[in-house]
Regions:
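Membrane-embedded beta-strand positions of outer-membrane beta-barrel proteins
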Residues: 74-78, 109-113, 151-153, 187-189, ...
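Transmembrane beta-strands of outer-membrane beta-barrel pores
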Residues: 78-84, 113-119, 155-161, 191-197, ...
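Outer-membrane beta-barrel "beta-signal"
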Residues: 204-208, 272-274, 313-327
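Cleavable N-terminal export/targeting peptides
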Residues: 1-69
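Outer membrane beta-barrel transmembrane domains
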Residues: 125, 236-305, 311
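Residue-level signature of outer-membrane beta-barrel architecture
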Residues: 97-101, 139-141, 179, 193, ...
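Short loop/turn motifs that connect adjacent beta-strands in outer-membrane beta-barrel proteins
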Residues: 60-71, 99-108, 142-148, 183-184, ...
Length: 327
């Protein structure tokens, strides 16, 4: 766990410095009149990362963006869950690659790497270091003025780098539709294959309501979120939000370095967050550009599930802090 904490401490300043530099750079470009800010779709955040699988630049509502045409979107994330006995720290890096030669808007290939340091009692026989190597493709289609359809497909190797059997391979996918009743209300319905042992498939259902430019209510299962605008200087917006949801992952590993097994971690969480992002048009909550999020929250209903022994271990409640950025 000390290794994971050190990794988190080193990584968090990198995230913050990168974002600060990106904010300064973006503000300067906007003042010079060279940036075009598009509109996009951002799914609920958290370790149910499958909902984040559709990159913002894949949205057909997005206009051309000169800054995004010059570089590939990169995402960074660092999270630490503080518990005296079973804490964990994780860091994540992902890159999105648009397939420009296919069609407009292009499908997006997303490549990711996640490292998790997990602290558990020695009697569990769980390695401290767990890794997730992922690749996937996502696409968005506008059927008409009211309907958009999103599809995604991906594969992931989640392992301690010792067990690379079928226990470690996870396949993900999803299909859901969005119906915009008006500029301020949209409805979402579909399902996502998580690749997790405890949650193979979950529904995605709910609505997003924005009664005015300063308030946005995302009542979308499995991660609802209520947002309030704090400040808007014309180029960037600062939001505060309250969110809930589930998080977790499944890995293949070698128990006591000899027996192939499968481990699933899951939790529920309630978080308070701050978000800094480029300003968009009134009534359009999702935009492309450099973003930063800082979350602090309470994590409960934490469980470890072991496939071979068909047993579960309940973990103590914990506090969580999370830094993330996309630029």
């Amino acid at each position: 766990m000390i290794r994971g904490l050190i990794c988190f401490i080193l990584f968090a300043p990198l995230v913050f410095t990168t974002v600060c530099f990106g904010v300064q750079l973006e503000s300067g470009v906007q003042k010079a009149g060279h940036q075009v800010v598009g509109k996009g779709f951002t799914s609920p955040d958290g370790r149910v990362t499958d909902l984040n699988f559709v990159p913002e630049s894949a949205d057909p509502l997005n206009g051309p963006s000169q800054s995004h045409a010059r570089r590939l979107p990169v995402g960074l994330k660092a999270e630490w869950i503080a518990d005296s006995e079973t804490g964990m720290a994780s860091t994540e890096l992902n890159v999105s690659l648009p397939l420009l030669f296919v069609r407009t808007p292009p499908p997006i290939v997303k490549i990711g790497l996640n490292y998790t340091s997990l602290q558990t009692p020695e009697s569990y026989g769980i390695p401290e270091d767990l890794f997730e190597y992922s690749v996937g493709i996502a696409s968005v289609r506008r059927l008409n003025e009211s309907w958009n359809v999103r599809t995604m497909l991906g594969v992931e190797l989640a392992t301690d780098n010792e067990n690379r059997s079928s226990d470690a391979w996870r396949f993900r996918g999803g299909l859901f539709a969005t119906y915009s009743k008006s500029e301020n209300v949209s409805w979402t319905l579909g399902a996502i294959a998580m690749g997790r042992q405890d949650l193979p498939v979950i529904p995605v259902i709910g609505a997003v309501w924005q009664p005015n430019p300063s308030v946005r209510v995302d009542l979308v299962y499995p991660q609802p979120r209520v947002n309030r605008l704090l400040f808007d200087d014309g180029s960037r917006q600062q939001w505060v939000y309250l969110a809930g949801g589930t998080s977790g992952s499944t890995w293949g590993y070698q128990q006591f370095d000899t027996i192939d097994d499968q481990l699933t971690y899951s939790d529920l969480r309630l978080v308070l967050g701050l978000e800094s992002r480029p300003a968009g048009a009134s009534g359009k909550p999702f935009v492309r550009g450099k973003t930063m999020q800082l979350e602090m929250g309470y994590v409960f209903s934490r469980e470890l599930e072991f496939e071979q022994e068909t047993r579960e271990e309940s973990l103590g409640d914990a506090l969580m802090i999370n830094f993330s950025t996309r630029f």
